[in-house]
């Protein structure tokens, strides 16, 4: 009986480890995320519509594991990037678009805001290398 438990434990640990390793979705470095609108340096009024762009990859909803795809995460006023080896957090500074959305309308307070896109795989983990847009800085009046 003890031997059966050990075999089961080895199988369980191996399966768990394999699922963790599967989260590391590679990109070929040719994919590019970008913010279509608003433009860097733009002065806008709230609400602000942010349009997402992606080339060299496709958009797929969270939970759908498909090569060369992912879904957008909008980083709003973050001081540093999240851990690129873990799922992207979900909070007011890290907005998830797991349904495959390619734009959002945000209510932003007056002032300067920094926007950046980070593509996540089916489990919200960034690709390797990360598919990350340039930082866009806007001013909301």
Model feature map: region roles:
Residues 17-18:
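N-terminal signal peptide c-region/cleavage motif recognized by signal peptidases
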Residues 88-112, 118-120:
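Short, solvent-exposed, Trp/other aromatic-anchored flexible loops in extracytoplasmic proteins
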